[in-house]
Amino acid sequence: MARYLGPKLKLSRREGTDLFLKSGVRAIDSKCKLETPPGRHGARKTRLSEYGVQLREKQKVRRIYGVLEKQFRNYYKDAARQKGNTGENLLTLLETRLDNVVYRMGFGATRAESRQLVSHKSILVNGSVVNIPSFKVSASDVISIREKSKKQARISASLEVASQREKPTWVEVDNTKMEGAFKRLPERSDLSAEINEQLIVELCSK
């Protein structure tokens, strides 16, 4: 399945919440009505079935992290094989994707932009170029911007935007050096309360 290239705000309206697909320079609610689904008949309220609610939650999380359906299924299988809570394991796996860590550190304004930085070989992991967005980052790994990429205006702009929002506690970033450390795996309490991972587990375990 191809990656979605259409309007980002349309996806946020579809899920009824900010999926953080835009840079955050301007509040998303000033751009569109999140409570109204996209389309000609978006204002019509439809009651979702139990399956529909579960599916929407899965789609929401998949779109937040920018992964394709097959990738998401593989992440779920890995999460189910691990000890502990499957839903929390799933979120942890998604959070350790390199493109997501680059975003969390503020080097990219969005996860999509962060994925592009990785793909274009602008990112180093422990001093070596890694151009695989799904690369799994481990605790204590050091993520940095490649020297020849440090002059990119979009990276400086992203760091400026990131400085205005609350920094994740599981990463530590030196904006001057354009370098950050992935200190630890995030705990469930660190992540968005708007995600109900149990709905995803109920859907995928059927």
From Swiss-Prot:
It comes from the Bacteria. SMART domains: Ribosomal_S4, S4. GO terms for cellular component: small ribosomal subunit. GO terms for molecular function: rRNA binding; structural constituent of ribosome. InterPro entries: Ribosomal_uS4, Ribosomal_uS4_bac-type, Ribosomal_uS4_CS, Ribosomal_uS4_N, S4_RNA-bd, S4_RNA-bd_sf. Gene3D superfamilies: Ribosomal Protein S4 Delta 41, Chain A, domain 1 (1.10.1050.10), RNA-binding S4 domain (3.10.290.10). Keywords: Ribonucleoprotein, Ribosomal protein, RNA-binding, rRNA-binding. Belongs to the universal ribosomal protein uS4 family. One of the primary rRNA binding proteins, it binds directly to 16S rRNA where it nucleates assembly of the body of the 30S subunit. With S5 and S12 plays an important role in translational accuracy. This is Small ribosomal subunit protein uS4.
